[in-house]
Amino acid sequence: MKSQEDPQEITTGLVATQDLPENHVFLIADPGLEEIVKNELQACLQKNSCNNPNIVTRPLGFDGQLWVKTPKGFPLHATAVKLRSIHHALIPIHYFDLPTENALAHIENEVGKLSLPLLNTVNSFRVTTQRTGKHNFKSNDVERRAGAALWRKYGTSVDLKNHDVDIHVNIFEHICLVGIPLHKKPLSNRYRKQFQPRIALKASIAHALLAFGKIDPTATSTVLDPFCGSGTILFEAAHYSSKLSLYGSDIDPHVVKGAQMNAEDLNLTNKIQFIQGDARELNTVFPQQRFNHIVTNPPYGLRFGQHLNFERFYIRILQQFWYRLTPDATVVLIALKWEKLSAALRLTGLYKILEKQRVDMGNVKPHIVSLRRIQKETE
């Protein structure tokens, strides 16, 4: 049986993967997190003595994508699937431009040219398409046409649920990329939760928040998420470092109970302390506790009402955070209304902005903002 790192017998009809002098992996993350992914990847590669990898961000011209090449003997595949900041890691097979007309026929023709001996060794396959951009076709149209081309060529059965191999035929605006994922489900879907709110933070974003916070995994420190929701940020923090003391709070007691259930399922009940409380009254929730880091995803107005005054809301929580933070502590938060947060920061004068990055999270495109608490002389 082949190990994960054995070269797969896949070709584009022109170049066989096993004949290339390098390993290739195509990474897909949330647009805007390219540098976070690159930094995480470089750290992982250096731990394995790969000091000169070829990492290209936005290789096809789009955010959220990286193309990685390493020497053939390096375990790139095993390294890629351990990354916390990505959704997918693919072995890239082929990519091509889409014509303005008859795009589906062109996709079917290009996929039909591929030499994929792997399909001769399995009982079933499926085609999965992720699509960004505006087109006159849908993702399932691509899946049907590409799947039909491969079925005609190899005769391998199509099984949408219990397939042996998944061929990704992804559409990025005007470019089609064909690849085989190194994993069965998105790498960001790593927590099985009994309690899952309708709007939940992806684990990849949670990892990015911790990275933006410059939290030293070798140092003992305390971390609070005062809008903890289902607990994703704290679960990711528990993996990030065993030296962190973790606290979570939420205004909704039902949410707190759900987060506790999730922590129990993940065997993290001894590592995270949850408490019910309003972040706008943090001094009463944690009257004696001070934190080195606050990492959180404040609500976008859904749980505090659609007519939430964001500027007033941000001013209030920034003030409350300041009192419960140690000198020189950091805050990392997601801000849907950056202009309102910016005004609140200016009016309070309690923090220095360290970093700001806009991230495409699908339906919303908020900013991740990293802050440093400013020490006051009267403190």
PLM region spans:
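Short glycine/proline-enriched loop/turn "hinge" motifs that connect secondary-structure elements
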Residues: 115-121, 170-171
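Short glycine-rich, basic-tinged beta-strand/loop micro-motifs
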Residues: 119-135
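Conserved AdoMet
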Residues: 62-117
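Class I S-adenosyl-L-methionine-dependent methyltransferase catalytic core
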Residues: 2-75, 113, 132-133, 137, ...
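Active-site periphery "cap/insert" segments of enzyme catalytic domains
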Residues: 150
